[in-house]
Curated annotation (Swiss-Prot):
Homodimer. The gene is hisS. One of its GO terms (cellular component) is cytoplasm. Belongs to the class-II aminoacyl-tRNA synthetase family. This is Histidine--tRNA ligase. GO terms for biological process: histidyl-tRNA aminoacylation. SUPFAM superfamilies: Class II aaRS ABD-related, Class II aaRS and biotin synthetases. CDD domains: HisRS-like_core, HisRS_anticodon. It comes from Brucella abortus (strain 2308). Keywords: Aminoacyl-tRNA synthetase, ATP-binding, Cytoplasm, Ligase, Nucleotide-binding, Protein biosynthesis. It is an enzyme of class 6 (ligase). Its main location: cytoplasm. Pfam families: HGTP_anticodon, tRNA-synt_His. Its EC number is 6.1.1.21. InterPro entries: aa-tRNA-synth_II, aa-tRNA-synth_II/BPL/LPL, Anticodon-bd, Anticodon-bd_dom_sf, His-tRNA-ligase, HisRS-like_core, HisRS/HisZ, HisRS_anticodon.
């Protein structure tokens, strides 16, 4: 036996989580519904590798000031730098560029998968998480952007989120870029300062207008004493940006009118406002008014967005770690990124897309009781009473017969006795167990114990003698009637679950 000092400690790397069966089933249940909606809209699945050449991913990580900071990278044997993907959009751009001549244009695709960020982990902030994206490449018109917003609204409703409990919020980066140009932040030389402004605006929901004012200026001191350096804008520029964020009106038409006043005289900003007006008309035509709204506070952190940007926000309250009621907030977002594919092609390739944060949306659905997998039925467990080869073969045939009938089943393969096997079956959430000892075998019979009914009856029968005499929820059947008897038990349990859920 190894010395205790030589034992390796089992530990999970920081920022990563293990996923247990219920989480996996819940995620698959949710993603199956998302796929149904995306398929309904005519999108096709595609999958790209976890690893890409680092230069193919670009320099677009959110909240990072240095190129490719925050990416897990390594060199291969050719000394080429490779990185784990940090989102699903940059790999899609590479895929489309590499297969451009064979793909239909516009190219409509969806994909889900793991992405990785080499960032400091914290509560709710992981280094590995799953996204579910849909994108249209090759469509220059904002009808493609509007469709993304409408598809996201339909997806949330298909998942059981009621109208009024969510909003798809829409803005246009051209409008914001027009404002930034007007205050002297145009050009690549001001990229870092523009990013600071975006970060400040993105904190509007958290800190309010006055907090954003501080972040646009010299900086903000929070309650803990930590100081966040601001964007160092002059007062006139701060007022211009705050006027932009405050342009939201009672409805889309009023918001658009307010934005027109903010960007009047700036061609880029006016173009962005017109695109929002066109999208608003499409939302009304499709019956999405009230579900999708124009909101100037939506900025999205990624630098590659070039036009409309959108965010899916859940509006119901949840209790945070401090016991306070807070709005759940964003579960996904996206926008137009006309420059990503163009990097590879050397010609304009318009594109737009939407990304769902799978884990965050799962949390929301669980809070609403819309993703319950507690009724998952475990396997029927065939207990092993005799371990000689001949009898093991007999138990194995029972399992095979059940599986051929489409019934999930397993033979106990551990080394424990009857009591431990029953405990194992209980932990596996087995609906019933199959028992055949020497007496049953000689009679050509099997015992089937309904564990679900047994638990229910055990709560009603308090006297141990009565319990032993009644042998509740246990039947004996001919061996050749095993499958039919098990199916009857499973069907009865299914009816009970359906009745209880009403």
């Amino acid at each position: 036996m190894a010395d205790k000092a030589d034992k390796m400690k089992a530990r999970l790397p920081r920022g990563f989580v293990d996923r247990v069966p219920d989480d996996l089933r819940a995620a698959e249940k949710m993603m199956a519904t998302i796929r149904e909606v995306y398929d309904l809209y005519g999108f096709e699945p595609v999958e790209t590798p976890l690893v890409e050449y680092t230069d193919a991913l670009g320099k677009f990580l959110p909240d990072q000031d240095r190129p490719n900071e925050g990416v897990f990278s390594f060199q291969d044997d050719d000394e080429q730098w490779l990185s784990l993907r940090y989102d699903l959009t940059a790999p899609l751009a590479r895929y489309v560029a590499e297969n451009f001549e064979t793909l239909p244009k516009p190219y409509r695709s969806y994909r889900n998968g793991w992405v990785f960020r080499n960032e400091k982990p914290g509560p709710g902030r992981f280094r590995q998480f799953m996204q579910f994206d849909a994108d249209t490449v090759g469509a220059p018109n904002v009808s493609a952007d509007a469709e993304m917003c409408m598809m996201m609204a339909d997806t949330l409703e298909r998942l059981g989120i009621q109208r009024g409990d969510y909003a798809i919020r829409v803005n246009n980066r051209k409008v914001l870029d027009g404002v930034l140009d007007a205050i002297g932040l145009e050009g690549e030389g001001n990229a870092a300062k523009r990013l600071n402004v975006l970060r400040a605006i993105d904190k509007l929901d958290k800190f309010g207008p006055e907090g954003v004012r501080l972040l646009l200026g010299k900086g903000r001191l929070d309650e803990s004493g930590d100081f966040t350096k601001g964007a160092q804008l002059p007062e006139a520029a701060i007022e211009k940006v705050l006027a932009f964020t405050a342009a939201g009106g009672a409805d889309g038409a009023q918001t658009i009118a307010n934005l027109q006043a903010v960007v009047a005289g700036n061609a880029k900003g006016e173009e962005g406002v017109q695109e929002l007006a066109d999208m608003q008309a499409l939302f009304f035509a499709g019956g999405y008014e009230g579900r999708v709204k124009i909101d100037p506070s939506v900025v999205r952190g990624l630098e590659y967005y070039t036009g409309p940007v959108f965010e899916a926000e859940l509006l119901f309250d949840v209790t945070n770690e401090d016991g306070q009621k807070v709005v759940f907030g964003s579960v996904g977002g996206g926008g137009r990124y006309d420059g990503l594919v163009s990097r590879f092609r050397g010609e304009p390739v318009p594109a737009t897309g939407f990304s769902i944060g799978v884990s965050r949306l799962m949390t929301a659905l669980k809070n609403l009781g819309k993703l319950d997998v507690s009724d998952t039925v475990g396997p029927v467990v065939v207990l092993v009473m005799d371990k000689d080869t001949q009898n093991l073969g007999r138990y194995q045939k029972m399992v095979s017969d059940l599986r051929k009938a489409g019934i999930r089943a397993e033979m106990y393969v551990g080394g424990s006795g009857m009591k431990a096997q029953m405990k194992y079956a209980d932990r596996r959430a087995a609906p019933c167990v199959v028992i055949q000892g020497s007496q049953e075998r000689e009679a050509g019979e099997v015992q089937i114990k309904d564990l679900v009914e047994g638990k229910r009856l055990s709560a009603e029968i308090e006297d141990n003698v009565t319990w032993l005499e009644s042998r509740p929820a246990q039947i004996t059947v001919r061996e050749d009637g095993l499958v039919d008897a098990v199916r009857e038990i499973l069907d009865a349990q299914a009816r009970d679950r359906a009745e209880q859920s009403k």
